[in-house]
């Protein structure tokens, strides 16, 4: 009897010790610099003064639920099961069996006066507009998460490194999620970045990481940042959320408009479909190029990640001349097959008043007169 008691006691103590070690390990993990810290002081005061900050968190222009309940009861999947399948589930065609094809352009060799866009996988883009070099949401790491075994990049999708990037006039960050704000990448780019533009709260990361605040432009939605008389960046609303761990929505998320005397470029950032797209299209009288989210969607969260038919409509709403899809081709963050976003958006774009281009990673899109690109994903497993 005493022996049984001792075994139970040892089991309980062992379990508590294991739990304590797990908690301590998690505590050490989240204290790493890459997790960032909550906004405070003057930055927090600016955040609290925003009309988009309500009851201690940022909110979208229209009330939305992150996980919607649009499906009939008998078709509603279990949320925990869905998230588990996304993070740890089997292949199911979500990850390509072959390497993603690429064509690595030498960025240093592109004349500055040439207006181009280069997709680098997922939502990372290199742009040259109005003689400026711009990098959007750079993620050159092998994982789009803080944990090495979650959200691994597709084979072949990481062809660029910070060493390949020329000196940048502007670094644009749409929000703080790991697949858009990557600590290792931005730290490697640090010596090359002249100006940073980001939404409210995201500047806290750059301050903690030692960037020069004199070159940080951290503003609310509907702010026009004039980096020069002939070069403006507008921070615009999107329908999404933020957070790098348990705390949600203490930093803002956004899209961008880049405006020069000759060209206008739109970057949607992550987000669901809403009337803000038509408002943006009217406000800027259309765009020469729109880089729009298309991928990692699901009916359970389509309020914060557009479905392909919604992306097609959004591109029409913003009056895009050229549509360049984003948020696919590198990470599996949903249950659809990796090719589906391209196939569905191509189908939904038929007959629309814009031209959809589908370059491989690293191929140059000439904003003035884009080439025809093949459907490179077809025939791949």
Residue ranges and their predicted role:
Residues 138-140, 176, 238-239, 269-271, ...:
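Active-site metal-binding loops of divalent metal-dependent hydrolases
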Residues 50, 150-197, 217, 285-291:
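Active-site metal-binding motif and surrounding structural segment of the metallo-beta-lactamase
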Residues 7-14, 30-33, 42-47, 53-55, ...:
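Cap/insert and terminal regions of metallo-dependent hydrolase folds
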Residues 127, 137, 175, 233, ...:
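Divalent metal-coordination and catalytic microenvironments
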Residues 122-128, 226-287, 302, 306-310:
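Catalytic core of the metallo-beta-lactamase
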Residues 140-157, 243-247, 298-304, 332:
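Acidic/histidine-rich helix-loop elements
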Residues 2-5, 10-151, 158-161, 164, 199-267, 344-363, ...:
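Metallo-beta-lactamase
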